[in-house]
Design a protein with these regions (language model features):
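Accessory beta-strand-rich segments of carbohydrate-active enzymes
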Residues: 1-133
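Activation corresponds to long, low-complexity, non-globular regions
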Residues: 93-183
Length: 183
């Protein structure tokens, strides 16, 4: 049997979904690095999530710290490159997919607040528009959405290396004790 390995290098944060299922428990991947000098790649085993025939691969991207105000970014991100490799039992590898101008993207329910800046110790925050939330990430839902071609952007001078630290994961969910309206 073959193994499917997805190598993701994002400037900004990412989550990966295949056929509507998140492929790891990681959040806000990759770890933060000196983004004007080094970016980190993360590898995911997609084998348990893949099916015969057509598969839907979805990348959920966020700018995170990759911004012109923080790292003199060439683009206000998020930016991503990925490669999907198939590794046969005998060790033979072939590349099945890479990011290029044929990819499509769209905005999500998350957006900038328009207030604040993104300098160290000054966080601009985000706004969530629940009206844009998707009920699921199935093919039927994704096919109904408007998608636009993505931009290809060259990012010079940044070295890519594998993430060598533990991923960020949710350790505990803290529920509110109460909710009351103020004012």
């Amino acid at each position: 049997d073959a193994t499917l390995l997805l190598h993701v290098n994002s400037l900004g944060y990412h989550e990966i979904y295949l056929n509507g299922r998140k492929v790891s428990e990681d959040v806000l991947s990759p770890a933060v690095s000196q983004l004007n000098k080094r970016s980190l790649s993360v590898t995911y085993d997609l084998t348990p999530y893949a099916k015969q025939g057509i598969n839907d691969l979805l990348l959920w991207l966020g700018r995170g710290w990759y911004r012109k105000a923080t790292f003199n970014a060439v683009h206000d991100g998020p930016l991503v490159k990925l490669r999907l490799d198939e590794i046969q039992a005998n060790g033979t590898a072939s590349t099945l997919l890479v990011t290029d101008s044929s990819w499509e993207g769209r905005g999500s329910m998350y957006g900038e607040t328009g207030t604040g800046t993104w300098y160290p110790h000054q966080f601009g925050g985000e706004c969530v528009d629940g009206r844009k939330a998707l009920p699921d990430l199935t093919t039927a839902t994704l096919d109904k959405l408007d998608w636009t071609p993505v931009l290809e952007v060259e990012v010079p001078g940044i070295e890519v290396s594998p993430q060598m630290c533990e991923p960020k994961r949710i350790q505990e969910i803290i529920r509110p004790k109460g909710i009351k309206q103020i004012g």
